[in-house]
Amino acid sequence: MNPIRKIIHIDMDCFYAAIEMRDFPELANKPIAVGGDAKRRGVIATCNYAARQFGIRSAMPTAHALKLCRELILRPVRMDVYQKESQYIRSLLTEYTDLVEPLSLDEAYLDVTESTQCQGSATWIAEEIRARIYQTRQLTASAGIAPNKSLAKIASDWHKPNGQMVIRPEDVSAFVLDLPVRKLFGVGPKMEEKLGALNIKTCADLQRYSVEYLLQKFGTMGQRLYELARGIDNRPVNPERIRKSISVEETYPKDLPNSEACLAVLPDLMARLEARIQRAGKISGIHNLFVKLKFNDFQQTTIERVMDKLDLIVLRQLIQEGFARRGMPVRLLGIGIKLKQENTYQSIQLPLLDL
């Protein structure tokens, strides 16, 4: 039986505008927008919440936005800056799981079902991610946590800005009943109008119709509507990038006091890593082995060695070398492999280790 999934949707709050306010503090609390010149028929890329109070929205013609708010401060698009910030945030997200699916520069899905970070709590992972983004970039993010992508995205918008919401598996059925159909993935203004003509305004209304009727009325979208109205969304989180590593890690309730204690938990980590490699199927071959240690002062170190196979002895050596760098109790220990970035793929033959 497959485990209930833990999906997080991270959505940066008015990303481009937030970067402008951070870099130019004098803009704080003033209505600002990022977009093209009105004289060149430009459009608004995004705006801050002060500007939204005037009715300004993304994709609105800049000339119209300036009519709605004469005090609007228009900032030019600095795409290189926004891309750099997005890359940093994306790198941070991959510290929690390899299963990160970017949707744009300012939002992404994470599947943390198998993550052991923050004691395996998706809620705590989302809180930590948001806190780290603010601490390191002075930008806020909102998060939604749910058993699937559709609900996670809905939840991330619930307490914006700078908030998060959890939809627990046992609460899904009750949550969707009063949910407006416009909130469903794929339901735009035209589809909302078609549903409204049938007096379908909420998911409870939609649940009254059979899948056969919805298929007849809306084609393949009918099946989707039938499932979404019941909180069903089986789409996987698909990482955009080629997988570069496979790893496992554990945050321990009691710090590991010395290198011997770290070595004592290695067999369990090794077994989990082998299982994860097996699930990955054919991969491009091993290039490096690495270990990660996070000490009780929250400083961390990573040490690696070029190897073409999984080797317990080498991992033991890396743990000892990594521990010696600080010689402090360890709160998190991880091991993993980095994969060859080649077009040839192979099945990894795992060693039969005497653990």
UniProtKB/Swiss-Prot annotation:
One of its GO terms (biological process) is DNA-templated DNA replication. NCBIfam families: PRK02406.1. Mg(2+) binds at residues 11, 106. Its EC number is 2.7.7.7. Binds 2 magnesium ions per subunit. This is DNA polymerase IV. Monomer. It comes from Legionella pneumophila (strain Paris).
